């Protein structure tokens, strides 16, 4: 689409979102068409909820996130085919693969293992691999990414090139609870098994999170070498493991419970990453 077309879509979506209390499954015309077109563009990867700028900062296209939210008001519940044993589901969002044949899969160029679930409006780039996992609507999964078994990519989350989300990893979405910006995993990151990154946090390029690291906006991310504390963002090429920090003493005692934190144990630049296995990086 041309820029004027996108500008027109954005204007319609913004106005509709301000008047969302009056929007329902009976709504027709310009609003429905704008929402449906926005979801199609997201599904194709022609637009995305967040884009990295030249200065390294991420710009969030809030109107696209609003289009995703409006779709829940517009779309009725319906039977979704493809359940186990020829059963069905009952939902408002169809599968990305609804109606696909071998031609569509070959053109898309990614691998979709049986029992992976991708909802319409999520984009999956060529050479990505989807094990039995869940990718929610509005998400963007870039080239060469591996979404391993039982991993979850939340609504509108941004997964970079060659990212590996290990088994059971959770990447938070923006819709429930409502977040200002999506959770972002930049290019060439490795997220260890059962780790969680949520609440619009950013893991910068080339970082490695060990198994069971949990990062939200209030999580202290402590650089062991400098003592610096980060919130909401893992610096580039950081190697991060789960840790604890001393807590305040309980009243009348000289002890207190320790509190969880994430610890940057080292920095591994691009050259080091290319020569070192993930397991070696995570060893202290």
From Swiss-Prot:
GO cellular component, one term: cytoplasm
Record-listed substrate binding positions: 111, 148
Reactions it catalyzes: (S)-2,3,4,5-tetrahydrodipicolinate + succinyl-CoA + H2O = (S)-2-succinylamino-6-oxoheptanedioate + CoA
GO terms, biological process: diaminopimelate biosynthetic process; lysine biosynthetic process via diaminopimelate
Keywords, ordered alphabetically: Acyltransferase, Amino-acid biosynthesis, Cytoplasm, Diaminopimelate biosynthesis, Lysine biosynthesis, Repeat, Transferase
Pathway the protein takes part in: Amino-acid biosynthesis; L-lysine biosynthesis via DAP pathway; LL-2,6-diaminopimelate from (S)-tetrahydrodipicolinate (succinylase route): step 1/3
One Gene Ontology term of the molecular function aspect: 2,3,4,5-tetrahydropyridine-2,6-dicarboxylate N-succinyltransferase activity
Highest rank taxon of the organism: Bacteria
EC number from the UniProt entry: 2.3.1.117
SUPFAM superfamilies in UniProt: Trimeric LpxA-like enzymes (SSF51161)
Subcellular location: Cytoplasm
Subunit text: Homotrimer.
Family listed: Belongs to the transferase hexapeptide repeat family.
Protein name listed in UniProt: 2,3,4,5-tetrahydropyridine-2,6-dicarboxylate N-succinyltransferase
Lineage of the organism: Bacteria, Pseudomonadati, Pseudomonadota, Alphaproteobacteria, Hyphomicrobiales
Gene: dapD
């Amino acid at each position: 689409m041309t820029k004027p077309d996108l500008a027109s879509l954005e204007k319609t979506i913004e106005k509709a979102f301000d008047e969302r209390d009056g929007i329902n499954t009976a709504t027709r015309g310009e609003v429905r068409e704008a929402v449906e077109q926005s979801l199609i563009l997201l599904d194709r990867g022609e637009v995305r909820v967040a884009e990295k700028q030249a200065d390294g900062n991420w710009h969030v296209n809030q109107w696209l996130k609003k289009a995703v939210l409006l779709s829940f008001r517009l779309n009725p519940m319906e039977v979704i085919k493809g359940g186990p044993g020829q059963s069905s589901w009952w939902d408002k969002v169809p599968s990305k693969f609804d109606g696909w044949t071998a031609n569509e899969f070959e053109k898309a160029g990614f691998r979709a293992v049986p029992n992976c679930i991708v909802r319409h409006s999520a984009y999956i780039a060529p050479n990505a691999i989807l094990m039995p996992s869940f990718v929610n609507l509005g998400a963007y999964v870039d080239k060469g990414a591996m979404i391993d078994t039982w991993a979850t990519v939340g609504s509108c989350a941004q997964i970079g090139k060659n990212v590996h989300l290990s088994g059971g990893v959770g990447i938070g979405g923006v819709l429930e609870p409502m977040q200002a910006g999506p959770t972002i995993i930049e290019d060439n990151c490795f997220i260890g098994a059962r780790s969680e990154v949520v609440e619009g946090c950013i893991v910068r390029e080339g970082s490695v999170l060990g198994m069971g690291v949990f990062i939200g906006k209030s999580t202290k991310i402590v650089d062991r070498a400098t003592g610096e504390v980060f919130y909401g963002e893992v610096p580039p090429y950081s190697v991060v493991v789960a840790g604890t920090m001393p807590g305040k003493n309980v009243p009348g005692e000289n002890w207190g419970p320790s509190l969880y934190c994430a610890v940057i144990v080292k920095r591994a630049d691009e050259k080091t990453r290319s020569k070192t296995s993930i397991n070696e990086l995570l060893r202290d």
